[in-house]
């Protein structure tokens, strides 16, 4: 039996793709699919961990996630650097506070860029000079009130804003 063998030298990428961590709610059934659809064809690697959230959706229950953020973030590629962490909870970010969410995430992953849906939305409103928005949410009135107050405070400081809820 004659076996021919060829050596092929592997060609590895010198740089790895940027690593994106996604903090998803334990009750969110679509975020991974949605996130992958948005990031389709981008040269990045996505790593997900879930954070426990409680029903019913109230500001008090949203605030309970604050204490979990650091430990859940640490479990995304433990000991490894991650370029970006996306905390996928608009209402939780608003209830807890963008700066507090960022602080907790960066305790677990120092130097990473932190984003949330509301952070990205506000950046987009500013970049596109949006002057009028409509907000449609699945939230109860008490949470909607918190969101509308936040948007009015965050955006109207920069320019005149009409908020339709």
Specify the residue positions occupied by each region the protein language model found:
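Conserved beta-alpha
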Residues: 101-104, 108, 112-165
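Short active-site-adjacent helix-start/loop capping segments
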Residues: 55-58, 93-96, 124
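A general structural motif
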Residues: 17, 43, 82, 111, ...
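Glycine- and other small-residue-rich loops at beta-strand/loop junctions that grip anionic moieties
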Residues: 24, 94, 136
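N-terminal glycine-rich anion-binding loop in soluble enzyme alpha/beta folds
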Residues: 1-71, 141-144, 148-165
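Glycine/small-residue-rich loop that forms an oxyanion/phosphate-binding "nest" at active or ligand-binding sites
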Residues: 73-117
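Alpha-helix C-cap/termination motif
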Residues: 38-41, 79, 108, 127-128
